[in-house]
Every structure is written in C-alpha cells, then in structure tokens.
C-alpha cells in the first residue's frame, strides 16, 4: 500500500511507542488520527507536531475503547473527518503490575479491565473498521502485542494472557478479512522511555536489558518502522514479529 495520502487511526497515539508510530506514518505521507483515552492536551500536541513537521492532516480523537458505542462513534468521526480510513494501529493498552504468584491481588476487576482494553477493545475496533476497508478494497491492521504474549513472563498474568489473545486474534482476523485487509502484529520487548519502564528504577531497566542478547532495551523506532513495513506490504498477513533485542531467548 502506498502510504502517501492514506489515513491511519492510531490508538494510544499519545503514548511513548504510539507517538513514534504516528511520526513514522506521517513521515511516509499518511494522515493520522491520534486516539487518546485521557490525555487530550498531549494528543493534540502530537497531532499539531505531525501537521507542522510533515504537512499532513492530523487530529486528536478521544475514545474509551472498552465501550462499544464509543468505538463506533470514533470510527464514524474519523471517517467523516478524513473521508476515508485505510489503516488501524491497535496500540492502546492497560496493565496493573501484579506478580504471577500473587493471585490474591489479581482481582477479577483488574482482569476484566485489562481484557476489555487489551483484547476486546482491538476486536471492537477491527469489527468497526472492517466494512470501511472492505468497501475501499484494501486495508491494513497492525496490532501491538508483547513478548509477554509469547511466554509466561511479564508484569501480570492478565496482561500476558491479553497479549497472547491479541496475537491469535491477529491470525484469526487475517483469515476473516482476507483478501482485502492484511492483519499483522508487532510484539515488542521492554521498551525504554515508555509507560512500562517509567515505573521501574533505572537499575531494573538495566538488569532487564542486560538479559537480552544485544544487551539493551528494544528500540521504539525499530517497532515503528516495522509497523510502517506492515502497512506497506502486499503479501504478508497473519504474522507476528518480535522486536526485543533477543531477550525472548533468555
């Protein structure tokens, strides 16, 4: 797909990785809908920077992706504002750090909220955008999962299971939406400078990075570049690419 003039909806577009994805897409000439859940001012700042730096149309849109009615409203507003919708990036996520062995503190309320945002939310969005993309004859969907979805590690069981579900949802939707819409997934490892590492001490980040083959955290720009590649591809679908500096092998 030629990204110049395409319209991309990026959920969590005001976050650390989300911002990099927005910039990478705009750099290719794509117009960007920056979706946020709470930080309107931050999202509007991202949209303004995209518009001024890359001369593209970029706007901020608020949405609680756990709410089906809000998702339908969001897709309608984006389609009306831009006149089309070619790309969906499911980057919005939620987590509560709970050690795997601490099942007493893994409440069903926490489980339900994590699943609602990390798995059901992307499903709602995919269902909402699918008819728009089908009518146009092509579309690209990229889900942002995690290496926690590939092995029983990470900051909580609920988060790991939600990301495992998102990886398999990618495969299932690749089948369901073929041949018009291609669906792929990026599974990052620990990313420095994101919400996930903001709550960690520097020595914790360094210790985690040192356990990777490349002895450093995964790179947000590498992830964003892979998202762009998945949007441009014509023959790749149903795939998950891990970007974690080789930490998954430890």
Q: Where are the regions a protein language model picked out?
A:
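C-terminal substrate-recognition "lid" of short-chain dehydrogenase/reductases
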Residues: 2, 138, 178, 219-243, ...
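Conserved glycine-rich cofactor-binding loop
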Residues: 7, 14-15
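The beta1-alpha1 cofactor-binding region of Rossmann-like NAD(H)/NADP(H)-dependent oxidoreductases
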Residues: 40-41, 61-74, 108, 221
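Substrate-binding pocket helix/loop in short-chain dehydrogenase/reductase
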Residues: 99-103, 107-112, 141, 197, ...
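Active-site helix of classical SDR
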Residues: 126, 162, 170
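Alpha-helical segment proximal to the catalytic Tyr-Lys
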Residues: 131, 174-179
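Residue(s) in the substrate-gating loop at a strand-loop-helix junction
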Residues: 146
